[in-house]
Swiss-Prot record:
Required for correct functioning of the GINS complex, a complex that plays an essential role in the initiation of DNA replication, and progression of DNA replication forks. GINS complex is a core component of CDC45-MCM-GINS (CMG) helicase, the molecular machine that unwinds template DNA during replication, and around which the replisome is built. The modification Phosphothreonine is found at T180. One of its GO terms (biological process) is DNA replication. PANTHER family: DNA REPLICATION COMPLEX GINS PROTEIN PSF2 (PTHR12772:SF0). It comes from Homo sapiens (Human). GO terms for cellular component: CMG complex; GINS complex; nucleoplasm; nucleus. CDD domains: GINS_A_psf2, GINS_B_Psf2. This is DNA replication complex GINS protein PSF2. Keywords: Acetylation, Chromosome, DNA replication, Isopeptide bond, Nucleus, Phosphoprotein, Ubl conjugation.
Length: 185
């Protein structure tokens, strides 16, 4: 799975918009959306929110966790813990990127939020590298990676898979070969 596919999955996450138009319910395969009334908040998938925002049909409300104070606490907690801490959304990085690229005018302190999320991302990727290094040095057979997001796994997945394959090959080459010759005299 590549980054574009992960972003596609993230676009299905629900966000809140405040429409400036009236429309009855929309019946889609993924579920019903609406009704849309001017000034009344409604939850829609991110892909629709971005589309409506681009056509100036709504205002996007940032997710509850997309707040400078909350993100600072999460960043500090992530830095203090040795293990990966739960993220506010399984798609926190993709949501931040998409919302800030398409609706930064609707998000207070957008630049600070971008920096805080990038700090959390960098901290988590650094932890992942340290974990992978420790994993290789200890010659472990399996690892437990709780609280990683799909994008984080995707970012390091190729490297980890290749590293594990190389380790497997090295281990099988180092094991003593079993004798195939008979010991009969």
């Amino acid at each position: 799975m590549d980054a574009a596919e992960v972003e596609f999955l993230a676009e299905k996450e629900l966000v809140t918009i405040i429409p400036n138009f009236s429309l009855d319910k929309i019946y889609l395969i993924g579920g019903d959306l609406g009704p849309f009334n001017p000034g009344l908040p409604v939850e829609v998938p991110l892909w629709l929110a971005i589309n409506l925002k681009q056509r100036q049909k709504c205002r996007l409300l940032p997710p509850e966790w997309m707040d400078v104070e909350k993100l600072e606490k999460m960043r500090d907690h992530e830095r203090k813990e040795e293990t990966f801490t739960p993220m506010p959304s399984p798609y926190y990085m993709e949501l931040t990127k998409l919302l800030l690229n398409h609706a930064s005018d609707n998000i207070p302190k957008a630049d600070e939020i971008r920096t805080l999320v990038k700090d959390m991302w960098d901290t988590r990727i650094a932890k992942l590298r340290v974990s992978a290094d420790s994993f290789v040095r200890q010659q472990e057979a399996h690892a437990k990676l709780d609280n990683l997001t799909l994008m984080e796994i995707n970012t390091s997945g190729t490297f980890l898979t290749q590293a594990l394959n190389h380790m497997y090959k090295l281990r099988t080459n180092l094991q003593p070969l079993e004798s195939t010759q008979s010991q009969d005299f």
